[in-house]
Curated annotation (Swiss-Prot):
<protein>
    <recommendedName>
        <fullName>Hypoxanthine/guanine phosphoribosyltransferase</fullName>
        <ecNumber>2.4.2.8</ecNumber>
    </recommendedName>
</protein>
<dbReference type="Pfam" id="PF00156">
    <property type="entry name" value="Pribosyltran"/>
</dbReference>
<dbReference type="InterPro" id="IPR050118">
    <property type="entry name" value="Pur/Pyrimidine_PRTase"/>
</dbReference>
<dbReference type="GO" id="GO:0032264">
    <property type="term" value="P:IMP salvage"/>
</dbReference>
<keyword id="KW-0328">Glycosyltransferase</keyword>
<comment type="subunit">
    <text>Homodimer.</text>
</comment>
<dbReference type="GO" id="GO:0052657">
    <property type="term" value="F:guanine phosphoribosyltransferase activity"/>
</dbReference>
<keyword id="KW-0808">Transferase</keyword>
<dbReference type="GO" id="GO:0004422">
    <property type="term" value="F:hypoxanthine phosphoribosyltransferase activity"/>
</dbReference>
<comment type="similarity">
    <text>Belongs to the purine/pyrimidine phosphoribosyltransferase family. Archaeal HPRT subfamily.</text>
</comment>
<dbReference type="InterPro" id="IPR026597">
    <property type="entry name" value="HGPRTase-like"/>
</dbReference>
<dbReference type="InterPro" id="IPR000836">
    <property type="entry name" value="PRibTrfase_dom"/>
</dbReference>
<dbReference type="GO" id="GO:0005737">
    <property type="term" value="C:cytoplasm"/>
</dbReference>
<comment type="function">
    <text>Catalyzes a salvage reaction resulting in the formation of IMP that is energically less costly than de novo synthesis.</text>
</comment>
<keyword id="KW-0660">Purine salvage</keyword>
<keyword id="KW-0963">Cytoplasm</keyword>
<dbReference type="GO" id="GO:0006166">
    <property type="term" value="P:purine ribonucleoside salvage"/>
</dbReference>
Length: 183
């Protein structure tokens, strides 16, 4: 499958002690090919519970191409949790802490009773996902499913233990000796 092939050949960048994989799905570089987006969206649709879902939710930035593609395939609108405040009525601020940053995310466009599916590009520490879940619960949404394309590290397990939600992923990876390894 193209997702796994492109992960195995993607560049690795070391920052401090951490090795980052640079991939079109997680970083938008070097080039996001339409066939890769189609494959990922098709795989998400196959494993996802979209029944009754009226909104797809992601956090900026790299979830945006994924939810746009999914929205076009499913005709379900999407909502993006943003890193900046808009001060719109009903806006829900939530603190986000990841392995590389801390800050606020802001949720708009969700109403009590909305049935949502959360989509994200990568889950590694779980910080972003916990923030998304907290914001959606505060807004009164019903989370029907959670899917992350790439799983790395213990974030999936951490989120599942802290929130009680199960997270589906398309591929689990690690970086070993400067290369992505599919687990």
């Amino acid at each position: 499958m193209l997702l796994e092939e492109t992960l195995k050949s993607c560049p690795i960048v070391k920052r401090g002690k951490y090795h980052y994989f640079i991939h079109p799905i997680s970083d938008g570089v070097p080039l996001v090919e339409p066939k890769l987006l189609r494959e990922v969206a098709t795989r998400i649709i196959k494993i996802g519970n979209f029944e009754g879902v009226n909104k797809i939710v992601t956090a900026e930035a790299m979830g945006i191409p994924l939810v746009t593609t999914l929205s076009l395939y499913t005709d379900i609108p999407y909502v993006i949790m943003r890193k900046r405040e808009y001060k719109l009525p009903g806006e829900v601020p939530v603190f986000q802490s990841t392995g590389y940053s801390k800050g606020q995310l802001y949720l708009n466009g969700i109403e009590k009773g909305d049935k949502v599916i959360i989509i994200d590009d990568v889950i590694s520490t779980g910080g972003t996902m916990i923030a998304i879940i907290n914001a959606l619960e505060r807004a009164g949404a019903e989370i029907k499913d959670i899917i992350c394309v790439i799983e790395r590290g213990d974030g999936k397990k951490i989120v599942e233990e802290k929130t009680g939600y199960k997270i589906k992923t398309l591929v689990k990876i690690d970086v070993v000796d400067g290369e992505v390894v599919i687990l």
